[in-house]
Amino acid sequence: MNCFSYFFLVIILCAGLNNAKFNEKNSVIFKSSLGPKKLLRIHCTSEHDDTDYVYLRHGQTYAFSFHDSVLKTIFDCELKQGSSYYNYNFYARFRAYKGGGLIVHYGKKNFWDAREDGIYFTHGKETPKLEYKWIPGDPSMRVESPL
């Protein structure tokens, strides 16, 4: 190969890497498909992050993005549904994202859809499937007996 061939190869490789999804953030996306008078409360945490409380009405979405850690990346979330900010009738706790370790993901998307019968999941390429059922009650209102 002559110098021009090497130069051309480097240009092609640089252009290809520039267009790749390398270093694109991963995302967790939530949608409320609950009834029009229902409120969805979302709270997600990881070892280093806390999303605070997010409230969605019917049809609204919420997303957060991040890079995978080389060690591991885990986001656990609690969703509650109810008729107001202080009245929740059902909840669900689950792992909304797991990644990192030996395989670092780039541009991975986890879509969660809160519906009346439960929480549905997809990566966006397939039809969402029911992953979690709602649990009756509000865990923050439970009182443990001292006995």
UniProtKB/Swiss-Prot annotation:
Pfam families per record: Self-incomp_S1 (PF05938)
Subcellular location: Secreted
Coiled-coil regions, chain positions: none
Principal subcellular localisation of the protein: secreted
Annotated signal peptide: 1-20
Keyword Hydrolase: no
Record GO biological process: rejection of self pollen
GO cellular component entries: extracellular region
Keyword annotations of the record: Secreted, Self-incompatibility, Signal
Family to which this protein belongs: Belongs to the plant self-incompatibility (S1) protein family.
Name of the protein in its database record: S-protein homolog 10
Originating species: Arabidopsis thaliana
Lineage of the species this protein comes from: Eukaryota, Viridiplantae, Streptophyta, Embryophyta, Tracheophyta
